């Protein structure tokens, strides 16, 4: 099967105007446990790497390889860890939006592309549906976010082995839900999420 690549990189229009583009994406909006990770990347104008694409379509090995390459090649990047407490306080959408806004304000750039997330910022921007498939910068952000979050969940798996975090990454798989029903929730579960809220009285 032919590898998918960001052939029609959304950045080109802005690179042709000599504008530096920041791409932002996140990993971990749907899980019941663990943090949300948001990452932004700014590349040199005209940057090319056909291997960089939506993190969900890449193998774990490939994502790990690209994780280091992206950080080496990027003009700048930022990775933010949004805790379970922040998610419960603001809700997942607002927590994601806040983190993306902070990255957009932190990194020097002329234009911002997010993966389907509008931001109230003083920079030109576009909220691009399936941005990680259309923009190399957003795709790079998705890879940094995904690898970072997967590593965190593997660490938590060592602390809470019965939940299968190394494999399910906190998503509501059968094993994970059954473990919640049997052992209760942990300190890293998102208490505002339905299946977790129901079992709050039982803490691992």
List each model region and its residues.
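RNase H-like, Mg2+-dependent phosphodiesterase core
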Residues: 1-204
């Amino acid at each position: 099967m032919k590898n998918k690549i960001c052939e029609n990189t959304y950045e080109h229009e802005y690179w042709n105007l000599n504008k530096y583009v920041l791409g932002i994406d996140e990993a971990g909006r749907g899980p019941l446990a663990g943090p949300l990770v948001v990452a932004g990347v700014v590349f040199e104008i005209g940057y090319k790497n056909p291997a960089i694409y939506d993190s969900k379509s890449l193998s774990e090995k490939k994502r790990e390889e690209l994780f280091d390459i992206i950080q080496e090649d990027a003009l700048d990047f930022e990775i933010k860890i949004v805790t379970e407490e922040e998610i419960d306080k603001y809700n997942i959408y607002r927590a994601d939006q806040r983190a993306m806004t902070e990255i957009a304000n932190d990194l020097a750039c002329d234009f911002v592309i997010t993966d389907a997330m509008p931001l109230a910022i003083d920079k030109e921007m576009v909220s691009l549906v399936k941005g990680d498939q259309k923009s190399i910068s957003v795709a790079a952000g998705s890879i940094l976010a995904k690898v970072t979050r997967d590593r965190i969940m593997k660490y938590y798996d060592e602390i809470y082995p019965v939940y299968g975090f190394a494999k399910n990454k906190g998503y509501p798989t059968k094993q994970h839900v059954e473990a919640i029903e049997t052992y209760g929730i942990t300190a890293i579960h998102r208490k505002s999420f339905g299946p977790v809220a129901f079992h709050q009285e039982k803490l691992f």
